[in-house]
Amino acid sequence: MKSPNRLLIGGVLATGLTSIPLCGAAAGFEFTPIGSAFSDDGSGSIRLKMPATFGVALQCGISVQGQVDETGVAQVTRVTFSGSTPLCSLITARGLPWNLVAKSTATVYMEHVSFIYPSGPLCGGNTILSSWTPYTQRLLVFNQIVSTGCEVVSMDVKISMLSIKYR
């Protein structure tokens, strides 16, 4: 007679093995058009807190460029900061490419987000949550900690060349 544990494990394995063919490839969302280059419209804005600003939010412009890879991930390969204060132009993006991974038509994970200010430590390297507004094609971020003492308070970037679709 088989023990109850063996029967349970056997049943779980049999159920798992019979369901594998039914699952198929994982469905998901992707940025389109695949293989296309993209850039923002030049009106992007970002508010950052970092040790170099002593926790005060610094308002800057942000510009992004990149390409959608064959898997539907939008890879941001160039980020520039600008603004009316000279401090903004001293911020440098790190960890590029920043991967924009669509989780739904409205949710995007931004991977590898990091930046540095000359007199401060590296901020980031984390994945942060952002929103995508399909009708205005805007990437929005609110109150995302990228590392200790470093935060993206807000970001708004319009990338009219991109859209998200279910694959």
Where are these regions (language model features)?
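Short, hydrophobic/aromatic-rich segments at coil-to-beta transitions
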Residues: S39-S45, T105-E111, Q137-L139
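Short beta-strand segments that buttress and anchor functional surface loops
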Residues: R47-T53, H112-F115, N143-Q144
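Predominantly extracellular/secreted and cell-surface proteins with exposed
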Residues: F54-P134
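Bacterial N-terminal signal peptides
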Residues: G10-I20
